UniProtKB/Swiss-Prot annotation:
Assembly behavior: Homodimer.
GO molecular function: glutamate-1-semialdehyde 2,1-aminomutase activity; pyridoxal phosphate binding; transaminase activity
Cellular component annotations (GO), alphabetically ordered: cytoplasm
A Pfam family that the UniProt record links to this protein: Aminotran_3
Keyword tags: Cytoplasm, Isomerase, Porphyrin biosynthesis, Pyridoxal phosphate
GO biological process: protoporphyrinogen IX biosynthetic process
Catalyzed reactions per annotation: (S)-4-amino-5-oxopentanoate = 5-aminolevulinate
Protein's recorded name: Glutamate-1-semialdehyde 2,1-aminomutase
Source organism of the structure: Salmonella paratyphi A (strain AKU_12601)
Named cofactor requirement(s): pyridoxal 5'-phosphate
Sequence similarity: Belongs to the class-III pyridoxal-phosphate-dependent aminotransferase family. HemL subfamily.
Broadest EC class assigned to this enzyme: isomerase
Subcellular location, record wording: Cytoplasm
Organism taxonomic ancestry: Bacteria, Pseudomonadati, Pseudomonadota, Gammaproteobacteria, Enterobacterales
Pathway it works in: Porphyrin-containing compound metabolism; protoporphyrin-IX biosynthesis; 5-aminolevulinate from L-glutamyl-tRNA(Glu): step 2/2
């Protein structure tokens, strides 16, 4: 047995499923998950000494690559001053100033510890500010594991939520309305059915949890218009897309102004950080200045703030996002070309430093139904054959891939060459 196999066997006796987040268990592709020893640049190194070109990037945060010296040094320096104070620090102010400067729609920002905390808190704030209970989310969009967001979508334009996790009361989930991503008709139907009851829409501007599905040109502006028409708030969940699709996020890339924005992943530089913010009048409703409660023992942790501050300063340097886009485009085009040569039907969506691989006969993938029609079994075989080639992709057909500026042209070429060999076996 490999060391990863031995560790996984031991972990399953001590940790549910052997992992601390379900997708890591390889249940989406089968087999034994890799246990990682270290990472540097664009590479992961497992406990058995094998190296992999990494396109997971810790599920998004590692836009600069692993073990970036500026972030590492910032963490070391901060740790020497103490690990946690439970009191305000200068770095929290500097971090808030940097974030609000980089994302102009955020007049104010509150730091939290994860993307889930950010979305959960933003939705509570929207409900408190509007005095309404219902929210709209979209099929295939994931916003963390808060109860109100763990809702299954059925067929049809509008579904009154049924929870898709035990432990979520149906009476609570009923306030979550699920609409079809990239379909404004379904959203209007929800508003017309509940014109005075919907507090907010929450949306991934690029859906990254049904692989990678960009918005149609009219979709995000249409959501903004519907929120304005019916008096609801628009929450854009930029946990994945923030500072990656563009410096000011997908909202800037697509030209839409939200009322609230949720951030995570890159904002922490690899440390556990989330944030939410937006219009000053809405944020003023948050405790301690307003009645909507939110708190966190480790929110604004000094080490996490130092890591995030260092990361964002690097990400803000000229040329970063152009490089991300060029590398991702080169990878996407190369994979499609290699698949076509092998007679394999393939679509690769990509926006900025995000991409998604779909085995499908369709020409485009634009919604949840398109994603679910893809060949998941072929993806599983592709994943494992690429792993044997030393390429680590997301271990699920429903998760986006992530590029970093640490990836080189040689890494991209080697990945395409590996895919060409793998396609010949599919």
């Amino acid at each position: 047995m490999s060391k990863s196999e031995n560790l996984y066997s031991a972990a399953r006796e001590l940790i549910p499923g052997g992992v601390n987040s379900p997708v890591r268990a390889f249940t989406g592709v089968g087999g034994t998950p890799l246990f990682i020893e270290k990472a540097d640049g664009a590479y992961l190194y497992d406990v058995d000494g094998k190296a992999y070109i990494d396109y997971v990037g810790s599920w998004g945060p590692m836009v600069l690559g692993h073990n970036h010296p500026a972030i590492r040094n910032a963490v070391i320096e901060a740790a020497e001053r103490g690990l946690s104070f439970g009191a305000p620090t200068e770095m929290e102010v500097k971090m808030a100033e940097l974030v609000t400067n980089l994302v102009p729609t955020m007049d104010m920002v509150r730091m939290v510890n994860s993307g889930t905390e950010a979305t959960m808190s933003a939705i509570r704030l929207a409900r408190g500010f509007t005095g309404r209970d219902k929210i709209i989310k979209f099929e295939g969009c994931y916003h963390g594991h808060a109860d109100c967001l763990l809702v299954k979508a059925g067929s049809g334009a509008l579904t009154l939520g049924q929870p898709n996790s035990p432990g979520v009361p149906a009476d609570f989930a009923k306030h979550t309305l699920t609409c079809t991503y990239n379909d404004l008709t379904s959203v209007r139907a929800a508003f017309e059915q509940y014109p005075q009851e919907i507090a907010c829409i929450i949306v991934e501007p690029v859906a990254g949890n049904m692989n990678c599905v960009p918005p149609l040109p009219e979709f995000l502006p249409g959501l903004r218009a519907l929120c304005d028409e019916f008096g609801a708030l628009l929450i854009i969940d930029e946990v994945m897309t923030g500072f990656r699709v563009a410096l000011a996020g997908a909202q800037d890339y697509y030209g839409v102004v939200p009322d609230l924005t949720c951030l995570g992943k890159i904002i922490g530089g690899g440390m556990p950080v989330g944030a939410f913010g937006g219009r000053r009048d809405v944020m003023d409703a948050l405790a301690p200045t307003g009645p909507v409660y939110q708190a966190g023992t480790l929110s604004g942790n000094p080490i996490a703030m130092a890591a995030g501050f260092a990361c964002l300063n690097e990400v803000a340097q000229p040329g970063i996002h152009e490089t991300l886009d060029e590398l991702t485009t080169r990878l996407a085009e190369g994979l499609c070309e290699a698949a076509q040569e092998a007679g394999i039907p393939l679509v690769v969506n990509h926006v900025g430093g995000m991409f998604g691989i779909f085995f499908t006969d369709a020409e485009t993938v634009t919604c949840y139904q398109d994603v679910m029609a893809c060949d998941v079994e072929r993806f599983k075989r592709f994943f494992h054959l690429m792993l044997e080639e030393g390429v680590y992709l997301a271990p699920s057909a429903f998760e986006a891939g992530f590029m970093s500026v640490a990836h080189s042209e040689e890494d991209i070429n080697n990945t395409i060459d590996a895919a060409r060999r793998v396609f010949a076996k599919l």
